[in-house]
């Protein structure tokens, strides 16, 4: 199973996170399948690869709690529901 998860990078006391699609059995810093975004909590900046995120959500990937909140704030789930309606 694939999850959309935060992967920590950056310096000590200056963490930034990549939003990655990763196998559920992998470690937090393990090998990811795809980098789909970037989140900087200090400057409150977010960069998202919306088509990549939608691709993994359509394939059944589950976002973690924090990633879910980030995606919800960015409005990704409204686009996801629109894509689901078009397919059905």
From Swiss-Prot:
Protein name from the UniProt record: Small ribosomal subunit protein bS16c
Gene3D superfamilies reported in the protein's UniProt record: 3.30.1320.10
NCBIfam families per the UniProt record, alphabetical: S16
Source organism (scientific name): Oenothera elata subsp. hookeri
Keyword Lyase tagged: no
Cited HAMAP family: Ribosomal_bS16
Main location: plastid
UniProt key word Cytoplasm: no
């Amino acid at each position: 199973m694939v999850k959309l998860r935060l992967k920590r990078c950056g310096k000590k006391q200056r963490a930034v996170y990549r939003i990655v699609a990763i196998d559920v059995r992998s470690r937090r810093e393990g090998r990811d399948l795809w980098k789909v975004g970037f989140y900087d909590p200090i400057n409150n900046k977010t960069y998202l690869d919306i088509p990549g995120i939608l691709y993994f959500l359509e394939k059944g990937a589950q976002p973690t709690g924090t990633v879910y909140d980030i995606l919800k704030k960015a409005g990704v789930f409204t686009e996801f529901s629109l894509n689901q309606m078009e397919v059905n």
